[in-house]
Amino acid sequence: QHFAAFVYFGKYGREILETLFETHKFVLPQWDFSIGLGSDILTTLHFYAIGDPLDLLSIACPAKYAAYLYSLLSLFRLYLAGLSFGAFCFIKKQNHVSSITVGSLVYVFTLFGMFIVSHHPFFALPMIFLPLLLLGVEQIAAGKRPYLFIVTVFLAAISNFYFFYMLALFTAIY
């Protein structure tokens, strides 16, 4: 169902862009009878695709190549989670590259991470955002500019409200 939403979101985005460039009108289709027995597009896709910034790439991908992009993005989410965890470790002055690499691999390839990405790929977003939020908190505590924190809060908030709530709780506990 996530893949079908990914493909539909790409088609939906291309339709919006075509309308914008051909008629010079910004029109968001609101209802589609091909979703179940008919459903609101934005509400349905918000859970599956609209909140994930990486899913915007589906707009540029033809439907016949969507399976490749979907699989690649699933792996890329894990890669980004490992990078964000590694960045957090480097800022915390863990200078042993081998330790950080092993820690990042353990963080990414836990059973939770593998299960989530294979079943619900956008659930990997909190694994990306949490280390970045904590890194932003560390930068603010060190008196540096809060841009990383602000951008990460923005991305987490538009991605999924529930994830944002949980990330805010974990950040407050930190």
Describe the residue ranges of each PLM region.
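Membrane-interface coil-to-helix junctions
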Residues: 1-81, 105, 109-127
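Membrane-embedded helix bundles of polyisoprenyl
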Residues: 74, 79-92, 96-174
